Amino acid sequence: MLFCYFLLNNLLNRFNGLNTFNNNILVIKELITNKLVYKNSISINYNSRIKSQKRIIQKINRLRIPYDIYGLRIIYEDSLDMNNSQFAYIIKDFICNNFYTIDYLYDDYIKYPKINKYQSLHVYIITNILIEIQIRNSLMNFNAINGTASNYY
């Protein structure tokens, strides 16, 4: 029941939730920057977005629930190991230890890539809105945007 409330809240307050979303993103960034211990060879970038009303409707028309109205992508690069995929799990564990997550929505596309070779971890956190967090390294991100996994569906 609580989950339905958050999902409905996301749908109804897509634009009203912008300040809340931005505040949550700042909290996540600050926590990762100040509390997560990682090597100097790793740099982290963040991309956030709010799904457009058109994309929400398209997803509903495909008979899917739009859990990902609010999204944050965490992209890291390890200058010593460009293929470092283990750091994604460190970030995921850190997020899971600091936020309320919905385990049954968790997807591990790093260990189990999609057919189109898409790789990323998807974690969903509940604040007063539901936020999808995608965690991937820069090579995975390049493939998602420009490579074999660049198709949207």
Locate each region found by the language model.
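Nucleic-acid processing machinery
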Residues: M1-Y153
